[in-house]
């Protein structure tokens, strides 16, 4: 019986040791979970800050794009009007030269 008692005692000691090892491993996992949760909270906060900043940058881009488009429109309209002025001044110059020639011819004809 004493051999059986000794075996039972050895099994009991080994069982207690295994349970203690499992508890230590569990505590290590709990520690890692806390660290991961803290990192997750930090990342979540950073993500919220970055998301807000991204929204602000997108709004800025939209406003500046709208302003750029307005500049493009004004420049295009101004260039078109300027081209019309150039064409008109060229036409006016051509008419003026022709009239000057006609006046000179009339003057010579009457002399």
From Swiss-Prot:
Subcellular location: Cytoplasm, Cytoskeleton, Flagellum basal body; Cytoplasm, Cytoskeleton, Flagellum axoneme
GO terms under biological process: cell division; microtubule cytoskeleton organization
Top-level taxon of the source organism: Eukaryota
Keywords, sorted A to Z: Cell cycle, Cell division, Cell projection, Cilium, Coiled coil, Cytoplasm, Cytoskeleton, Flagellum
Mutant phenotype after disruption: RNAi-mediated knockdown results in multinucleate, multiflagellate cells.
Main location: cytoplasm
Effect of residue 20 to A: Drastic reduction in microtubule branching
Disulfide partners: none
GO cellular component: axoneme; ciliary basal body; cytoplasmic microtubule; motile cilium
InterPro entries tied to this protein: SSNA1_fam
Parts forming coiled coils: 6-71
Assembly and oligomerization: Self-assembles into fibrils in a head-to-tail fashion.
Matching PANTHER family: MICROTUBULE NUCLEATION FACTOR SSNA1, SJOEGREN SYNDROME NUCLEAR AUTOANTIGEN 1
UniProt similarity note: Belongs to the SSNA1 family.
Function per UniProt: Microtubule-binding protein which stabilizes dynamic microtubules by slowing growth and shrinkage at both plus and minus ends and serves as a sensor of microtubule damage. Induces microtubule branching which is mediated by the formation of long SSNA1 fibrils which guide microtubule protofilaments to split apart from the mother microtubule and form daughter microtubules. Required for cell division.
Name assigned to this protein: Microtubule nucleation factor SSNA1
């Amino acid at each position: 019986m004493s051999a059986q008692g000794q075996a039972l005692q050895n099994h009991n000691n080994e069982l207690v040791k295994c349970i203690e090892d499992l508890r230590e491993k569990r505590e290590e996992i709990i520690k890692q979970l806390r660290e991961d949760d803290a990192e997750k909270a930090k990342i979540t906060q950073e993500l919220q800050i970055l998301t807000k900043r991204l929204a602000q940058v997108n709004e800025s881009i939209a406003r500046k794009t709208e302003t750029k488009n307005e500049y493009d429109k004004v420049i295009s309209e101004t260039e078109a009007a300027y081209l019309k002025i150039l064409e008109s001044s060229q036409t006016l110059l051509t008419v003026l030269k022709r009239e000057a020639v006609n006046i000179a011819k009339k003057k010579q004809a009457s002399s």
